[in-house]
Regions:
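Bacterial N-terminal signal peptides
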Residues: 8-17
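Periplasmic/extracellular electron-transfer cofactor-ligation site
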Residues: 24-72, 76-82, 90-102, 124-128
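Acidic/polar helix N-cap motif
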Residues: 25, 110-113
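Histidine-centered phosphotransfer motif of kinases
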Residues: 120
Length: 128
């Protein structure tokens, strides 16, 4: 009897350990983008006109400060890295801590909301 109980506990633990973390919700990220980001940034079709900040179409994988149609602050212009989902998360959590001197005034403190916005941004291609 004890063997069956232990086997059941072990199997349950294995299932829990192998269950992937829930994926970010790009559709929710689009809603958040439209409400929080689209005032300053362009995203996908219908997300807003932006214009005060760089276009975020194709931002994942793009050089930091790499939108040729935007005049970045020096800290972003001088950056050599490319935007990844991790670097975007760090930046959006606290832009001025991540890159002191940035003009980005808004942060996204909620981890799930930030992940959703980044999932949405990752879905956008530069040509959209």
């Amino acid at each position: 009897m004890k063997t069956y109980i232990l086997a059941g506990v072990a199997a349950g633990a294995l299932i829990v350990m192998s269950t992937p973390v829930l994926a970010a919700d790009a559709a929710h990220g689009q809603e958040l983008f439209r409400g929080q980001c689209g005032i300053c940034h362009q995203g996908g079709e219908g997300d807003g006109d932006g214009g005060q900040g760089p276009s975020l179409r194709g931002v994942v994988g793009r050089k930091v400060g790499g939108d040729p149609n935007f005049a970045y602050t020096q800290v972003l212009s001088d950056a050599k890295d490319k935007w990844t989902t991790d670097s975007l998360s760090t930046f959006l959590a606290d832009p001025n801590k991540a890159m002191p001197g940035t003009a980005m005034p808004i942060s996204v403190k909620n981890d799930a909301d930030r992940a959703d916005i980044i999932a949405y941004l990752a879905s956008l291609k530069a040509s959209q």
